[in-house]
Amino acid sequence: MMVSRRELFGLAAGAALQAPRLAGQEGQRPVFRVKVDMVVLAFTVTDSKNHYINGLKPPDFRIYEDGILQKLNTFAEGTKPPLLIADDGTARPLVDAQGSGTAPEGGPVGLDRPDAFIGTNVFVLFDTSNFMYRGFVYAEDAIADFVRGLDRADSVAVYTFSRNLSRAAVLTRDHNDAINGLRRSVAGDDTALYNALLLTLRDAAKVPGRKVVIVFSNGPDNASMVAPDDVRAVAEDEGITIYTISTNEVTKDTISNSALRRIAQRTGGKAYSARTWQKQVEAFESIREDLGNSYTITYYPAANPNEGFRKIAVEIVSDPGKKFRVHTRPGYRPSRSL
C-alpha cells in the first residue's frame, strides 16, 4: 500500500495510539511506505575547540549520498535569507526584500512557499506528567525564556503531554502567543512521551523548511504504544532535528536517558541532562546557539538504486586539512516501512 508522507503520519499515529484494540489481531500489523522528495539537511560546523565555523558559502560544501554527489537546491546560514542555487552554481535570494518568493511558478515542490525557509520551525514538547510535578513551574520559566530569545524569523509551537498530547500553542511567529499557550498548560498523570513525540513529528512534517523538536521531559515513559527507535527513525527520515533535555538523574534511569540520547544524536541534535533550573536555562541557550550557527541545505536526491538506508556525507571543500567537524544526521531511508 503506497501512501503519501503526510498520510503515513496520520495512519501511523492512529495505529500506534489504538494498538491495545488490536492486541488480538496478531500478524495483521499494517505496513505503510513513504517516499522522500526534497531532502532538508541541517548541520553545524565546528573546529577542534568546538567553536562554530561561520561564513561558509555554497561552493564550500559537497553533499554525498552513498558516495553520489548531490546538486544543491537551496542554502542558508543561521537566520539569513536562503539562497536558490542555479544549475551553474550561482546563487540568488530565494526570498526578496519584500518577502516575496523568487522560485519560478510551477517549480519544484517544496519551494512553493519560499518564506517558510526563513528561520527555523521550533516545536517544544513539554512533559507535564506527574513525573514533572516538583519542577513544573521552573521548567515553564526556562521554556518561556527560551522562546523569548528566539530570532523573530523563527516560528515556534508549544505542545504539552502526559498521557495525551495537547497543542498549547500552534506554530506561530508570535512568540508571546506561544508563551501564553505555555502558561495555560496544566499538570497531568501518566507519561506517553513517544506517542506524543510521534504526533509532534507528524505536525512538523507538514511544514516546509527546517524543523526542530525540543523534548523537555523527566525521561520515563509508562504509557506509549510506540518504541523509541521507531520514532527516532521517522525523525531521521524526515530530517527533523531533535534536542532532548532530561530533568532526571542519568544514573537513576539509564534506559530512558540512553533512548533520549540516541534519538538526539541520530537526528543531528544534542542531549542534555539538566536537573536544576540553571542547567535547564543553559541547555536552552546551547540549543539557541546551535540554531543561530547552523547551515541548512536542500537538494533533490540523484538517482540511487539503494532503497534502504542512505548514508549522507558533508564534505567541506575549503577544509583540506579536515580540521572541521560536521554535526548532522548520518542518513535516511528514502522509502521505509512503519
Pin down the residues of each PLM region.
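N-terminal secretory signal peptides and thylakoid transit peptides that target proteins
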Residues: 1-14
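Scaffold/interface architecture of coatomer-like assemblies
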Residues: 23-338
